[in-house]
């Protein structure tokens, strides 16, 4: 298949969680296709039946949708497992052409002959003339001489002497093609012109380039993007590092912030600004500008990015974005978690993000109350999940209990101050400026400045020593509930001071 159009593919395996490295590769491929007016193909490489799970495939599609690579904007998904017949046909063709041979060597036999052979298989069956049969794998006949030169947009021209490349297996003894062959055959048949993938695949590239040549077709443009490392400069690991894209979604990272940050892992937009609209990224991204050196995944920087994106939302958008963390089983709102990568579909509409249920019952939540407090909270959260402990006092029947906070603040003049504050608040206009001035007056009678005077009031009403602006919070909570909590705190302090 050859159309003259740029055609890229993203080819994940559904054998585990979809991680940030896969997300970056998908975005890089997407932008190569978009920038050239070409095609993006989603190919699910699901040939490992023992490890594949349908939910992993669903997770890949959902994650791409969240990133803005939405169904309808690309070809696929194409499932590699459905192309087994074509892979077998290609393997048979290579055998018939003398470019591959059958090998009956077991691992034990190979080890007995070679020990720890530097270059792997020793070619024992190369000239034995074996045909297909039980226990026989098909190996590619690697050229004895010459050098395979890989033309890589990012890495230049790495060279691989052919005598260092073993006769590698291309089909198992059961006839199924291994990754190396299936990947090449699918790329060839789908007319893939650019292969953009992780650096870890570079070692496979000379073998695959030899297969492309054996199948009579020039190889695609290669581009191996840099490995992503943690703060210890170790390659990101699913077992060791926080890499699951879904965990970031559940924590409250916005798709736009995630896309922006992932694009910086190996590439940088022109100018000094790193936080830029995706349209700017799309217009300026070029594979030639990707750096080959390892890219550091800095979660603190990502968090800072996300805070900037949250603050850039309108209040209505912020309210909608917070909904999954405030209302049990709410879907991710499409209004905010919509496609970040050029707006090609419905974003996350209909996709439920697994976020913890809030600590209050659904009937206690008030959208009107949250809309009132949202402007106070928006500038104070870096991820959306932080909204829950910030506003929980508004929707719980009692202020959250923090005994350490209580012990720290409920001493000295706290009992008298809370008693007088409750009495004063019963009479004044319920306005945050009035509430503030009133507490200043109460505090002055006890020799306390406002910072000290408001500490026991905050703990009594919100359960915490820090939080949203206190007097605006009291205004939103309302006179009746504020007075009830202040009096409950007074009663507790009085009981402790005067036990029966």
Curated annotation (Swiss-Prot):
InterPro entries, alphabetized: aa-tRNA-synth_I_cd-bd, aa-tRNA-synth_I_codon-bd_sub2, aa-tRNA-synth_I_CS, aa_tRNA-synth_I_cd-bd_sf, Glu-tRNA-ligase_bac/mito, Glu/Gln-tRNA-synth, Glu/Gln-tRNA-synth_Ib_cat-dom, GluQ/Sye
GO biological process: glutamyl-tRNA aminoacylation
Domain of life according to the entry: Bacteria
Motif ('HIGH' region): 12-22
PROSITE patterns reported for this sequence: AA_TRNA_LIGASE_I
Gene Ontology molecular function: ATP binding; glutamate-tRNA ligase activity; tRNA binding; zinc ion binding
EC number(s) per entry: 6.1.1.17
Residue stretches spanning the membrane: none
Pfam families: Anticodon_2, tRNA-synt_1c
Cofactor or coenzyme needed: Zn(2+)
Cell location: Cytoplasm
Coiled-coil stretches noted in the UniProt entry, renumbered to this chain: none
Predominant cellular place of this UniProt entry's protein: cytoplasm
Binding-site list for Zn(2+): 103, 105, 125, 127
GO cellular component, one term: cytosol
Catalytic activity: tRNA(Glu) + L-glutamate + ATP = L-glutamyl-tRNA(Glu) + AMP + diphosphate
Cofactor note text: Binds 1 zinc ion per subunit.
Protein task: Catalyzes the attachment of glutamate to tRNA(Glu) in a two-step reaction: glutamate is first activated by ATP to form Glu-AMP and then transferred to the acceptor end of tRNA(Glu).
Family the UniProt entry places it in: Belongs to the class-I aminoacyl-tRNA synthetase family. Glutamate--tRNA ligase type 1 subfamily.
Subunit and partners: Monomer.
Official protein name in the record: Glutamate--tRNA ligase
Organism annotation: Parafrankia sp. (strain EAN1pec)
